[in-house]
Amino acid sequence: MANLHQQQIIDKIQNITFKDGTFLNEVISDIIIKGNNIGFSIDISGKNKLEAEEIRLKAINELNNIKDVNNITIVFTQKKTIDKKAQKPKHFVENVKKIILVASGKGGVGKSTISALIAQQLSLENYQVGIVDADIYGPSIPHIFGINEIPKTVEGRIIPILAQNIQIISIGFFVKAHSAIIYRGPMASKIIYQLLSNTRWNNLDYLIIDMPPGTGDIHLSMLENYHLDGVIVVTTPQKISEIDVIRSIDLYRKLGLPILGIIENMIYMLESDRCGHLSKKYNIPLIAKIPIIPQIANACDKSLPLTNLLTLPLEKYL
């Protein structure tokens, strides 16, 4: 047993996962090797205890395949949870059934285009749909939908602009074209609250939120303050995009938001299977791989429906 090391343990249990997609390797710690005996801890915070016991037995079964191992000790640990009574209640958005975030780890991956496509496709399927352009530092939705007007207000509530039968609100409606938008984190979060909760939505089945890139204050504010139904993550084949999207996955999992799937955009820019790898590693569905289609840019510039060019298998994931 002198040659036994931690990597052997990690390798043996690398394919064991919880039902929520968490790999066992991600939640183990305190690996101890003493002679023929090995042991470690599993953090089961937020996990079902019966499932955790099944995972423990699977791990023991795999580790028994290591030559000469005698005793295997696996203990459960759990992080101290915050008293639910002390947690701030989350907001529901009036007249909205489901809220879906569209997010990315980095900018420039086509997130706003995908948000528009999802909304347009759902609308064609006879759902009532709205979009909040929450990318307040670079709002693109007004351009994609060809909107150049300022929304009206009635009794202090904003009336969303209707375009292609989709109810739309964006910070871009309230600033001059080509003007820089500069907000600190708290102010940015306050603006998102105004766009969401101070808009008079008309009986929406789906509200699609085009999020800013990254994992900053706006993301935390949304996750902590609103009842959300899931997030779709958009990425591209580059390695840097993969690194950033992993950070996003980590954020949403830590805060308990279901990740509905990954969309890989512009896949012919680089030949790779990065998203296939991410999908398998994190047990997240790969919704679609979208090639570079020059007509998409033209459709966005001319405010034409993107559904004329491609569709997504949304019924499986939303």
Curated annotation (Swiss-Prot):
Keywords carried by this UniProt record: ATP-binding, Hydrolase, Iron, Iron-sulfur, Metal-binding, Nucleotide-binding
The keyword Glycoprotein is annotated on this UniProt entry: no
GO MF annotation, one: ATP binding
Tree of life domain: Bacteria
Pfam annotation, one family: ParA
Ligand binding (ATP): 105-112
Single Gene Ontology BP annotation: iron-sulfur cluster assembly
InterPro entries: Mrp-like_CS, Mrp/NBP35_ATP-bd, NUBPL-like, P-loop_NTPase, YlxH/NBP35
Cited CDD domains: Mrp_NBP35
Self-association state and partner proteins as the record states: Homodimer.
Family in the record: Belongs to the Mrp/NBP35 ATP-binding proteins family.
Function summary: Binds and transfers iron-sulfur (Fe-S) clusters to target apoproteins. Can hydrolyze ATP.
Official protein name in the record: Iron-sulfur cluster carrier protein
Source organism: Rickettsia typhi (strain ATCC VR-144 / Wilmington)
